[in-house]
């Protein structure tokens, strides 16, 4: 059982959610809200199902990531009703409900049927979840304004949520260290993944997302999804982007490790890490997240010039001409919570110069964000530069040398505090 402090924080968390949800129901004219946990759909033409990922609002309340066909009914002035599906089944094991104090805050029911519980005494009901599971239920299905308001309840994390995220970081960092050790010992991508799973005691299907484990040029594929079973003749670099789910909450951490005799690339990794430290320290109340993203591009420009990858252009010119976007094509980060890319990050669309930015808000206490600058050598992005009017400013021989290392990304999970920030990842790494 978790420590008593965490369990006490969870009791407070449930109380906070009850107040937040009752206010949302009041604001939108509903008596109650029925939340589906979801269920894994079946593969077409097969008797196997896809991997199950629980629905965010259900996880927000319960943290029960593996419970399919469960239902949560929120009612004003009453205990939430938690209905769990427990069929009589000799093919599969049933998940056990943890015997923890937070359950006292709920009315519990168990059902052999996957159907929703009977709904009585509510004239205005909303139901949210996968539409395929809501068919035939009374009430308004996934009303847009209400769903947006529910997303907003997840923007500012409770103390319990931050504690869960901190533990998810601690568990993940043990995996990252094991992955680094395996890489330096000459392991393949597949073996590195096994080392990560062993250290985190987590199956692939239980992870918050598929671990990205790229060796050498594979580190330049942003969401590289395969694992080579044979190690390369020379292991020059490792990029691992991997997390852990703890009580429903996700960590999302990236580290880049260099092999021996990679002096130029190692210097770039060190330079990007120093930039990442500075960017993390920018996280504070009142800071526009877009400003952190744009600051990153100027930092990337300085690294490119210092490394001799480009010359003859100022940092301002490298940014304004779009050269840095070829080396750093994604956003600086996103919200983090019960989903890796947590909700409500883009109340306004990202600007044209940052189309992939997942967070466009001014930071406030209680928000949790990732800070993940990258510097990559991606042929499809660099070839247009090399053949364009600014190509003569780029050191092609050096670029050719570095492309075999793929790229660099360094990512931490950072809490916005009342006065600045708290870096959960560096705490776990210490």
What are these regions (language model features)?
Residues 1-430:
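Active-site neighborhoods and metal-handling regions in enzymes and metal-associated proteins
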């Amino acid at each position: 059982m978790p420590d008593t402090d965490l369990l006490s924080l969870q009791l407070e968390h449930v109380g906070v959610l009850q107040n937040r949800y009752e206010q949302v129901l009041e604001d939108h004219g509903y008596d109650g809200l029925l939340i589906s946990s979801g269920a894994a759909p079946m593969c077409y033409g097969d008797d196997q199902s896809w991997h199950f990922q629980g629905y965010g609002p259900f996880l927000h309340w319960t943290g029960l990531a593996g419970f399919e066909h469960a239902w949560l009914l929120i009612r004003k002035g009453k205990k939430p009703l938690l209905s769990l599906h427990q069929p009589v089944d000799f093919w599969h094991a049933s998940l056990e409900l943890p015997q923890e104090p937070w359950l006292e805050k709920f009315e519990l029911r168990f059902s052999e049927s996957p159907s929703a519980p009977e709904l009585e005494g509510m004239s205005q009901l909303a139901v949210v979840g996968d539409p395929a599971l809501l068919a035939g239920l009374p009430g308004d299905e996934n009303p847009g304004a209400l769903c947006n308001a529910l997303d907003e309840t997840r923007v500012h994390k409770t103390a319990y949520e931050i504690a869960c995220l901190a533990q998810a970081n601690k568990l993940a960092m043990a995996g990252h260290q094991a992955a680094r050790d395996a890489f330096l010992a000459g392991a393949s991508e597949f073996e590195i993944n096994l080392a990560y799973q062993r250290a985190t005691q987590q199956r692939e299907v239980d992870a918050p997302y598929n671990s990205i484990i790229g060796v050498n040029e594979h580190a330049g594929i942003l969401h590289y999804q395969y694992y080579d079973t044979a190690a390369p003749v020379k292991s020059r670099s490792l990029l691992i982007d991997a997390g852990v789910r703890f009580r429903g909450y996700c960590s999302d951490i990236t580290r880049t490790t260099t092999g021996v005799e990679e002096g130029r690339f190692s210097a770039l990794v060190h330079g990007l890490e120093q930039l990442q430290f500075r960017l993390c320290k920018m996280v504070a109340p009142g800071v526009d997240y877009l400003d952190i993203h744009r600051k990153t591009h100027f930092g990337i420009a300085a690294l490119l010039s210092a490394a001799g990858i480009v010359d003859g252009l100022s940092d301002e010119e490298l940014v304004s001409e779009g050269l840095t976007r070829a080396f750093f094509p994604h956003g600086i980060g996103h919200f983090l919570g019960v989903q890796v890319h947590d909700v409500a990050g883009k109340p306004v669309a990202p600007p044209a110069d940052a189309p992939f930015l997942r967070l466009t808000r001014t930071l406030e206490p209680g928000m949790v964000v990732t800070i993940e600058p990258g510097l990559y050598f991606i042929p499809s992005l660099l070839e247009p530069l090399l053949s364009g009017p600014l190509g003569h400013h780029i050191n092609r021989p050096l670029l050719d040398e570095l492309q075999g290392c793929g790229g660099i990304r360094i990512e931490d999970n950072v809490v916005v505090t009342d006065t600045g920030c708290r870096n959960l990842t560096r705490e776990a790494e210490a």
